[in-house]
Design a protein with these regions (language model features):
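Tryptophan-anchored aromatic micro-motifs
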Residues: 51-63
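Glycine-rich, aromatic-bearing surface loops/beta-hairpins
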Residues: 160-209
Length: 209
């Protein structure tokens, strides 16, 4: 099956990747180690991915380059359906320049791993291979690669994706984007569901204002 290339990610990351690749050759930069997921086991409120994202969710996000410069803003309407241990999560994006995009995740709950953490695997059209991760306490971390088409060539970037549940109806997402093992940017998203989401409905995905 042919993977759909994300034009949105391509435009976001192309200039940053070229710049950082040059810096890497000259300076040997490396990315920082992240938190050990298992250390968050006692954090609350507990996150269960399939129950949190079942039904309608709205989200607001930004993309920053590795230097902290704001590159893009966006909003998202999400709709999740659960069938047994499978969560199908549809995402519809509107960016601040008027561009639209969408993604559908199919996420499977695998059960507890040897480390005692609940494990998940997921697939989406613009993700190469399978995203894999786990949940501890109020946090989820999963890793995946996205293949972009740039100037007629394919380029793969890596996402180190963290979700932290803050309230029954609120979660914060921080995803670190890297290439050649070097962080090139980060995505921050706030997810709202329940009454918080209803207060913002209908979410305008036609016009940015």
């Amino acid at each position: 099956m042919t993977r759909r290339r994300s034009s949105v990610l391509r435009r976001l990351l192309q200039g940053v990747i070229i710049l950082v690749a040059g810096i890497a050759v000259l300076g040997g930069l490396s990315s920082c180690a992240r938190t050990d997921l298992a250390t968050l086991q006692d954090r609350t409120p507990q996150l269960e991915l399939e129950s949190f994202f079942a039904g309608e969710t709205v989200a607001f996000g930004i993309f920053e380059d590795r230097f902290g410069n704001l590159r893009r803003q966006f909003r998202v309407a999400l709709n999740g359906t659960v069938d047994g241990d499978v969560l199908t999560l549809e995402e519809f994006f509107l960016y601040d320049d008027g561009e639209k995009d969408q993604r559908t995740w199919v996420i499977r709950k695998l059960g507890k791993g040897e480390d005692g953490l609940m494990r998940y695997a997921g697939n989406a059209a613009d993700v190469t291979g399978t995203a894999r991760g786990g949940i501890a306490g109020n946090a989820m971390n999963w890793q995946y690669d996205v293949v972009l088409s740039m100037s007629g060539q394919e380029l793969e970037v890596h996402f180190d994706d963290w979700i932290y549940r803050q309230h029954e109806d609120v979660a914060i997402n921080r995803a670190y984007v890297s290439k050649f093992g070097i962080e090139i940017g980060a995505v921050t998203i706030v997810f709202l569901r329940g009454d918080a989401a209803k207060a913002l409905q209908p979410l305008d995905l036609e016009n940015w204002s």
